[in-house]
Amino acid sequence: MDAPRFERYSSVPLFEGLQPEEIGALLGYSEQVEVEPGTVVIQEGAEPTDFYVIAEGVLDVVLTDQVEEAKVLARLSDLSCFGEMGLVSDESHSASVIAVESSRLRKFSIARMKELLDMEDRTVYRMVLGLARLIAHRLQMSDERRVG
């Protein structure tokens, strides 16, 4: 991948504020995977091992309630990320993520990212700062929904 292709990923919340070459370095730690409609990429209740950035496609975030009925919580598309909470929490996945259409994903190993953090990789630290901003934004949105 060259710099102009990296710039496409600059709108990914985890990569906010990173330079194209830093985004390229992070993408170098990932692998591209392709999934077909109906593929369960993340299973509710499973231990987190990877997180993903959607290069192209549409996936649903689905929660199963007490009577085993699936409820779509969100629909994700190009340049959205999911599974990233596994970087900061060992909690099992709170929802499933299922492909709605054929999709291309960038798959990042959580273990590899943690190794890089242990090695004090500056770019990965900056990505985790992006994760902190994303979590803060989600909490703010959740609070606004409760109040409004």
Regions found by a protein language model. Name each.
Residues M1-G148:
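Cytosolic regulatory regions built on CNB/CRP/Popeye-like sensor folds
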